[in-house]
Amino acid sequence: NKMRAVFMGTPEFAVPTLQALIDHHEVLAVVTQPDKQRGRGKKMQFPPVKEKAVEYDIPVYQPQRARDEEFIEELKKINPDVIVVVAYGQILPESILNIPKYGCINVHGSLLPKYRGAAPIQWAVLDGEEKTGITTMYMEKGLDTGDMIDKAEVVLDEKETAGSLHDKLMVLGADLLLETLKKLEDGTAVRKKQND
């Protein structure tokens, strides 16, 4: 069964998960950060997620602030079953978290509760971790504090860099999200608390 989804994400890391959603579910809209000026010509550059959305003619929203009333009203009108968030880059207010019936599901690039917040991939490499991975979780008001649903692990190579690990994890994240959505739909998703 296809879920009606809104996708929120910005950098290249988020693109494989968006692609997986497009391939297996119905993506009603994509939300990403505003375009950035690049270089001296001040040409506007689309975030990678927007480029992918445009390729598939999916409506794109780029609010300066996700807590803008007008934007939240738009999301309520769209009324998705689920909102999937991957490296979006803004904190979401409760008024957004409460819209979808299956909640807002975040794909995070670490094995939570380790490496909450920014740069989890870089930190795993810098700290010499033997393994890291992806966690899917329910979003709450705090930063990366919500209940976890699924995890997938990856072992770091001797020569692992943040770049090589990033590329592994972004593919793993797309796969794990699809599994998580299946569980949400079947009612088999188990919420696990993050025990600090």
Report the location of each language-model feature.
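Short alpha-helical
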Residues: 12-13, 70, 91, 143
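Positions that flank functional sites
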Residues: 36, 68, 140
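Donor/substrate-binding cores of folate-linked one-carbon enzymes
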Residues: 82, 86-196
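N-terminal Rossmann-like dinucleotide-binding module
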Residues: 2-41
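Solvent-exposed polar/charged
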Residues: 23, 54, 76-77, 98, ...
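Amphipathic, non-transmembrane alpha-helical secondary structure
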Residues: 15, 19-22, 72-76, 94, ...
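Internal alpha/beta domain cores that form substrate/cofactor-binding pockets in large enzymes
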Residues: 4-6, 26-31, 59-78, 83, ...
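N-terminal beta-loop-helix "entrance" segment that forms/cooperates
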Residues: 36-56
